[in-house]
């Protein structure tokens, strides 16, 4: 199916924050995903992000809000090409003593061996999980893996959590 047709399908079957029944995901959607950015943040976007369009701006601002909320002390980039703006953002937001690692995944051919080194506090940010058939297959394998507890599918970006003490759920959220 065409990338844009998949987007419209996702748009019509996804939910807002009121369609979620998980307190963790409701809070994530309400306080991070649907949060408005202040005008200064939008004006200070890197030029390469601004040049790629509104969709990339929204993703960049979302990643910025995620990094502000989820304290982390390590990050790993699994990308095919250099993403200088994102790397700078991750370096700027890194803290200490949080014992969380955030993985930013933007590759075509990936396997699930990455999950062997992940802890329950870690988070995966998967860029464009529907961009190609290979990425969509990887995204579906991630969602089905037993180590993955919560996935939040925003179509252009996917969030994966490994939280213990919560039942396995996959959420389609309108973004």
Model regions and ranges:
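A short alpha-helical cap/connector motif
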Residues: 1-120, 130-175
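Short beta-strand/loop segment that forms part of the nucleotide-sugar
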Residues: 124-127
